[in-house]
């Protein structure tokens, strides 16, 4: 029994040493730029530097003026595009792409015809030929 305990103890010590030495060592902290440049695999001089530019009052006013012009032009364009009222249909008929099941009246467009699908469950007025 003493031999098995001795064997287990040596196995435990071996596993402790193995786990301790198998982990990578902690990296050293780099305190100055020289050591960073020498140890780094990527050269920091390859990347372009970033420059910060402060805006002056004139540039801000120009951008505001441009924004106001854009807003006013959009408002004018929306005012110009006033929706024209549609003329009311004189006869009871079905407009294009509306449902035209058999009890419904005929299609308003003379070039359109009523097409049914799925055993006449979904019917709609469609224009078949563009030359009409």
UniProtKB/Swiss-Prot annotation:
Cellular compartments annotated: Secreted
UniProt-annotated stretches for the region Disordered: 61-87
Pfam families attached to this UniProt entry: Agouti (PF05039)
One of the protein's GO biological processes: melanosome organization
Residue span(s) of domain Agouti: 93-132
UniProt keyword terms in alphabetical order: Disulfide bond, Glycoprotein, Knottin, Secreted, Signal
Disulfide bonds: 93-108, 100-114, 107-125, 111-132, 116-123
GO MF annotations, alphabetized: melanocortin receptor binding; neuropeptide hormone activity
Signal peptide per UniProt: 1-22
Role description: Involved in the regulation of melanogenesis. The binding of ASP to MC1R precludes alpha-MSH initiated signaling and thus blocks production of cAMP, leading to a down-regulation of eumelanogenesis (brown/black pigment) and thus increasing synthesis of pheomelanin (yellow/red pigment).
Protein's name in the database: Agouti-signaling protein
Organism encoding this protein: Macaca silenus
